[in-house]
Amino acid sequence: MLDLAPLWISLRIATIATVVTFFVGIATAHFMHHYRGRGRALLDSIFLAPMVLPPTVLGFLLLILLGKNGPLGFLFTNAGISVVFTWYAAVITATVVALPLMYKTTLGAFEQIDSNLQQAARTLGASELTVFRRITLPLALPGLIAGATLAFARALGEFGATLMLAGNIPGRTQTLPMAIYFAVEGGDFREASIWTGVILTVALGGLVSVNRWQPQGRRLAKREGKKEDLMLVSAQENAQETDGPEKLERPDRLRHYASMLRPAHAPTLSVTLTKHLPNFTLDVSFSADEQPLGLLGGSGAGKSMILRCLAGIETPDAGRIVLNGRVLFDSEAGINVPICDRNIGILFQNYALFPHLTIAQNVAFGLHQKLPPEQIQEIVTQQLSAVHLEAFAERYPHELSGGQQQRVALARALASQPEVLLLDEPFSALDTHLRDQIERQLIDRLQDYQGVTLLVTHNLDEAYRVCHQLLVLDGGTTIAHGPKHNIFEHPQTVSVAQLTGCKNISPALTHGPNQIEARHWQCVLQTVEPVSSNLTQIGIRAHQINLQTYPQASSAPNTFPCWLATTSETPHGMTLYLKLHRPPTNERDYHLQAEVFKDKWSSLKDQPLPWTVYLDPLRLILLEAD
């Protein structure tokens, strides 16, 4: 009769080793995921060494370590514990050989998690333990299960190291691989075949189950999402465009909740920070109040870095951040409030919704867990109602469109009533029609929001419509800060003019108190404002150039003949490239860019050249050096 002892011994050893490996592997992977020291490569190699070393070499090293004269074996012997040639020696070898698989698989799962998800959880008030428990582990779960399965299969099949450390003692340390080996050695191929089939069934069965479980779960979620999409999405999107009483009443439902958390004094944010980056040094100082502040600048100017420093995701090298009288960061005093304690909400570019949580759970994530469940449910319902998504409460983020995800992210950020709301290019992933809708809804939400708002955007129109104040950055430094009207209508420097969309700029020379020469345009211009001694250039915006087809007296100020060099068409207008004084020699030979609507272009295009261009003195922008 077949002795089943090797099967039970193998299952017991592999199970215990897998349990130990599971927790040790997760802890090791979590440590290595955050460790960035110089010894990272060495530590990683040590953890992976059992996977590449020959089993006999590994067994010999363990024998030296745990033998009677070994450093650990000596301690065990003095304590009356003998490790070698016992069943728990087999557990040790199985754990050592299985650990690399669990560690590497788990580390890969951790590295695939979008770091913005963890940062979003921290900004919503979650501690590191909460982030690990509610975000990291659930998102890494498929990898953890795969790693545990591989570890179990490896522990079940361990032979060489186990033979050297635990020996082959029937009924005590003889595992399935050893039973197979000695059965073949004794000529009992029937027993060897049976045990081989058992190992194949157990090991491959577990791997197949894991491989089938993961895609099946994803397909199920997608199918259920698509079932309701046909009925709910179109109805919900249509409801957003209606202007009935329900739409007007929904924001009112939040007023009572918002009034309870309204600050006693007007919110204030004071920021002075310096951070050294690879290409430049971010050095800014500004303040903000309840009126939204827009951050404008080219790519890499430091706009998003400012938000990350405010939220606590990045640490400035020097500076001070004070919010409503509370110091969040002070390099001199050594103060750096953790992310979870800053009460700052941030809307990431990719929205950073937690994919394993429903929409309602996402919105409720930042609410204090000590609140009564009824109050949490009420707040979640109010927030989703305000963004017209209450019907989607039990759905998951991947079942929503980009615009719906953006609104959920905004509702989640506002649910806990943060003192500061940071918006990092919130409309960048939306199409034009949806962008306009979401922008209007954002403006409506901000009217009831009683905190400080900072908006990062590359879109000038967005910044102008949403924000009252603007902060213009170039190369990490502030080049303009003030009301949006002043910055757009009276930019002081060339960089500010260019960043606010001025396309016509020319070096200038002063000819008198109200007269300058535009050197590139080869003309003398009259100005309304007195010319400053610091004047270096002059500009005019493309849409403010006045074009006429009838000739005017050449003595009229700022009036010149012009010829059309080439055109560029947009959906609703035309950009005209104009050469002053004489016809152009080629398409690139032009002085000015003028933008006109297509109805204006229809009346211009058939008129004979030259046309007349008028540069209104009120529209001229007098610029100083940066």
Residue ranges and their predicted role:
Residues H265, V271-D317, I321-V322, R326-V327, ...:
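Non-catalytic connector elements of ABC transporters
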Residues A415-E419:
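A short, proline-enriched helix->beta-strand linker immediately N-terminal to the Walker B motif
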